[in-house]
């Protein structure tokens, strides 16, 4: 009797098994879990020493299966808990390095928690749940091992619950499943934070606040540049390289002049500065002093030169246009003591510095991209009247420290600062060289931080209000089919509302009735339903989250190929015009396709699902 019950239960599960082409998350989870178990069983019974290449392939396949399974679980969590406040907070990800955040991160974390040996983030990970340690991270391993065990244990329980629920009803989530999903979400978030923090350096709260202050400063500088016509809105929209170069330069001017107590507060402790500008503290102080003695006209000329990127700019008829040399900057002063000579060095376009000798004394200065002490020394050689004679590294450090103390205790006289330069053009050229030297080094020394700050101001996140109510299931239905299941990204990003399958019984374009053979196909661009003949084209839609080619209807295909067709000239204020244009386009497309079908039927070569020539117009 017991054997009969077991056989009946097994047969019941086979009967209730979800369809392969079902697009519900629970149905997708069932087959993804089956694929993961198959790969795991094959890997357990495989001797990796006999065929290491095959073993490596199986490990990669296992990682992909784990990653896909976690993406499906994440899709379930977003569907069951649509409000972000109900899910685990993941704001800590802003502290992670940019190269860490990718789509395969969840799978790598799971694999790293229970696999034997795995290279992730350039390190070798050992089995945490089995008691091994991460190489060179023994203390961190002991701290996160309980989290890894709790995560893997709960994940096994969750997989059993989800698989059982998928056999019962793939469209319903029981209260027990919901509680388990929520608990897993919090466990995985906690493990992710501690695991990544142990492997790679992450930003502290103060460092992240400093980065946000820099982003605000860059944003203010960009806004001011647009108001003063230094940059155009078209350049910003197109992410012109000129914008990428000019914004850091203008931000230095804004931070030192207009926001002295902000992100570039050089009067405070240098340790409070962002890591991006900390090594340039002494040079920033001298740039600030020179900027303060400029009049409004000279300041505009400096900012214009920083935007154009031209080292030789014609500022006026009486300005010096020829290349400046060290001899042009020799200025002898008289007084009680020895005369002081200002030595200036011209900075080449590629950032290298040339050394010159004068009055029998030589002083070699390394490139501006060198160490901090050399950078400070180079700054004083340009902007300070004190002459440096020692060329050794120890002497440079000692002299720089003394000069730092001298400048802080005795603020420079504006009249003396201006008297060191022959003309206004000389002063502007010196400022241009120093500001560009600091800003351009950010791209070399801190490329990741600079890229993230520029991304914040050039590609801000749009806040879209979302209702807290869960959308009904028909609106979340997607097209059936294994080929689409493999092509769509997970979690899928749907930017348009799809027409439910139950609301459409015929093709939107040709009005052909859908049957068992003629299937429904959603256009990824407009969300309407078409037959295969009227949606035989594919295009990538990155603005909707589809980086790879996905199915689009013939109408949207031609619109994407030729967006300047006559229908785009319709007035946006009248919806009737667009509706009439769409209906006429659908009618004309249907007539042409029906004529083609009629001709093929006469030749005896018609097929219900044969693709035809693409005929489309704009929506």
UniProtKB/Swiss-Prot annotation:
Classification via InterPro entries: FYVE_LST2, LST-2, Znf_FYVE, Znf_FYVE-rel, Znf_FYVE_PHD, Znf_RING/FYVE/PHD
The entry's keywords: Metal-binding, Zinc, Zinc-finger
UniProt entry tagged with the keyword Methyltransferase: no
GO function term, MF aspect, one: zinc ion binding
Keyword Zinc-finger among UniProt keywords: yes
One Gene Ontology cellular component annotation held by this UniProt entry: early endosome membrane
Highest taxon, organism lineage: Eukaryota
Chain positions recorded as Zn(2+) 2 binding sites: 523, 526, 553, 556
Region (Disordered): 598-619
Record's compositionally biased regions (Polar residues): 603-619
Stated role: Negative regulator of epidermal growth factor receptor (EGFR) signaling.
Family membership noted in the UniProt record: Belongs to the lst-2 family.
Zn finger residue spans: FYVE-type: 501-561
Protein name according to UniProt: Lateral signaling target protein 2 homolog
Chain residues that bind Zn(2+) 1: 507, 510, 531, 534
């Amino acid at each position: 009797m017991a054997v009969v019950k077991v056989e009946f239960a097994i047969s019941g599960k086979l009967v209730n098994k979800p369809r392969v082409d079902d697009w519900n998350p629970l149905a997708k989870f069932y087959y993804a879990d089956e694929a993961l178990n198959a790969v795991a069983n094959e890997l357990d019974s495989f001797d990796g020493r006999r065929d290491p290449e095959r073993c490596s392939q199986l490990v990669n396949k296992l990682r992909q299966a784990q990653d896909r399974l976690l993406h499906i679980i994440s899709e379930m969590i977003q569907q069951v808990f649509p409000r972000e406040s109900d899910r685990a907070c993941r704001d800590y990800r802003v502290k992670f390095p940019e190269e860490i955040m990718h789509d395969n991160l969840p799978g790598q974390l799971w694999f790293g928690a229970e696999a034997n040996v795995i290279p992730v983030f350039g390190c070798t990970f050992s089995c945490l749940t089995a008691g091994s340690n991460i190489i060179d991270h023994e203390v961190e391993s002991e701290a996160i091992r309980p989290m890894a065990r709790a995560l893997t244990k709960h994940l096994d329980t969750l997989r059993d619950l989800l698989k059982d629920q998928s056999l019962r009803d793939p469209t319903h989530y029981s209260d027990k499943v919901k509680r388990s999903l929520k608990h897993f979400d919090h466990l995985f978030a906690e493990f992710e934070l501690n695991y990544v923090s142990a492997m790679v350096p992450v930003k502290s709260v103060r460092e992240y606040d400093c980065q946000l202050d820099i982003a605000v400063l860059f944003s203010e500088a960009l806004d001011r540049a647009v108001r003063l016509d230094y940059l155009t809105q078209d350049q910003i929209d197109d992410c012109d390289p000129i914008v990428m170069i000019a914004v850091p330069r203008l931000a230095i001017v804004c931070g030192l002049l207009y926001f002295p107590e902000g992100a570039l507060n050089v009067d405070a402790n240098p340790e409070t500065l962002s890591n991006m500008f900390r090594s340039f503290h002494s040079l920033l102080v001298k740039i600030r002093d020179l900027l303060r003695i400029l009049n409004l006209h000279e300041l505009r000329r400096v900012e214009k030169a920083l935007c154009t990127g031209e080292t030789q700019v014609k500022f006026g008829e009486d300005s010096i246009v020829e290349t400046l040399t060290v001899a042009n900057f020799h200025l002898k002063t008289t007084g009680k003591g020895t005369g002081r000579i200002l030595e200036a060095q011209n900075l080449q376009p590629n950032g290298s510095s040339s050394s010159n000798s004068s009055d029998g004394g030589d002083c070699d200065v390394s490139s501006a991209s060198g160490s901090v002490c050399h950078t400070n020394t180079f700054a004083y050689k340009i902007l300070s009247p004190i002459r440096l004679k020692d060329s050794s590294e120890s002497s440079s450090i000692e002299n720089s420290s003394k000069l730092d103390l001298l400048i802080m205790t005795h603020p420079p006289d504006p009249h003396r600062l201006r008297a060191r330069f022959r003309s206004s053009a000389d002063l502007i050229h010196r400022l241009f060289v120093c500001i560009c030297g600091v800003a351009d080094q950010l791209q070399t020394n801190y490329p990741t931080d600079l890229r993230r700050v520029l991304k914040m101001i050039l590609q801000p996140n749009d806040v879209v209000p979302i209702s807290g109510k869960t959308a009904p299931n028909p609106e979340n239905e997607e097209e059936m089919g294994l080929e689409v299941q493999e092509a769509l990204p997970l979690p899928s990003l749907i930017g348009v509302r799809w027409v439910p399958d139950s609301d459409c019984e015929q093709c939107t374009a040709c009005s052909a009735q859908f049957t068992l053979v003629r299937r429904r196909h959603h256009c990824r661009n407009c969300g309407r339903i078409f037959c295969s003949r009227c949606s035989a084209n594919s295009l990538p839609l990155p603005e909707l989250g589809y980086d790879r080619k996905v199915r689009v209807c013939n109408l949207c295909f031609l619109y994407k190929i030729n967006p300047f067709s006559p229908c785009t000239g319709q007035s946006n204020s009248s919806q009737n015009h667009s509706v009439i244009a769409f209906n006429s386009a659908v009618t004309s497309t249907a007539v042409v396709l029906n004529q083609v079908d009629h001709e093929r039927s006469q030749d005896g070569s018609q097929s219900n699902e044969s693709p035809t020539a693409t005929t489309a117009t704009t929506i």
